[in-house]
Curated annotation (Swiss-Prot):
The family this protein is said to belong to: Belongs to the universal ribosomal protein uL16 family.
GO biological process, one term: translation
Renumbered residue ranges of the record's region Disordered: 1-22
Composition-biased stretches (Basic residues): 1-14
GO molecular function: rRNA binding; structural constituent of ribosome; tRNA binding
InterPro entries attached to this UniProt entry: Ribosomal_uL16, Ribosomal_uL16_bact-type, Ribosomal_uL16_CS, Ribosomal_uL16_dom, Ribosomal_uL16_sf
Originating organism: Synechococcus elongatus (strain ATCC 33912 / PCC 7942 / FACHB-805) (Anacystis nidulans R2)
Signal sequence region: none
The name this protein goes by in its record: Large ribosomal subunit protein uL16
Keyword flag Ion transport: no
Primary role: Binds 23S rRNA and is also seen to make contacts with the A and possibly P site tRNAs.
PROSITE patterns, A to Z: RIBOSOMAL_L16_1, RIBOSOMAL_L16_2
Keyword presence, DNA repair: no
Length: 142
C-alpha cells in the first residue's frame, strides 16, 4: 500500500475540504481518466483496491497511472481509552481529494469501452461520486 517513506512530522491536523481542485484536474498521461465529483479522504487501501480492480479487468493491457498519493496521517486512540493524555498514534494514510481532481488514468492499447468498464469497477471501491473523462471530452469543455 502507498505511504510516504518519511515525513517531517508524524501527526497532522484534520483540516478542511472546501473548494475545488485547482491542480491535477486535467489528463496528463493517459487518454482516459476518472475524475472526482465530491470531496473526501481516500485511504491507501481504497486506492490499492481500485488499482487491483482496474489491473485485473484490463489484463495488463495498457498502462495505469495513479494521480493521487496518501500523504496525510490519520491518528486514532485505542478503544475505551479515557479522554486526554495526548493525540493517538497514526493508524493509516489518506489522500485529500477535492472535486475536479483526476484520480486515475489509463493509456496505451486500451479501447474506450474497456477503459470505461475498468474505471467503473474502480469507482465502486471509492467513497465518492466520480466521472469518466477522455481527452476528447476535455477538449470540448475547454
Amino acid at each position: 500500500m502507498l505511504s510516504p517513506r518519511r515525513t517531517k512530522f508524524r501527526k497532522q491536523q484534520r483540516g478542511r475540504m472546501t473548494g475545488k481542485a485547482t491542480r491535477g484536474n486535467t489528463l496528463a498521461f493517459g487518454n482516459f481518466g476518472l475524475q472526482a465529483l465530491e470531496c473526501s479522504w481516500i485511504t491507501a487501501r481504497q486506492i490499492e483496491a481500485s488499482r487491483r480492480a482496474m489491473t485485473r479487468y484490463t489484463r495488463r493491457g495498457g498502462k495505469i497511472w495513479i494521480r493521487i498519493f496518501p500523504d496525510k496521517p490519520i491518528t486514532m486512540r485505542p478503544a475505551e481509552t479515557r479522554m486526554g493524555s495526548g493525540k493517538g498514534n497514526p493508524e493509516f494514510w489518506v489522500a485529500v481529494v477535492k472535486p475536479g481532481r483526476v484520480l486515475f488514468e489509463i493509456g496505451g492499447e486500451v479501447a474506450e469501452e474497456t477503459a470505461r468498464e475498468a474505471m467503473r469497477l474502480a469507482s465502486h471501491k471509492l467513497p465518492i461520486k466520480t466521472k469518466f473523462i477522455t481527452r476528447d471530452s476535455e477538449a470540448q469543455e475547454a
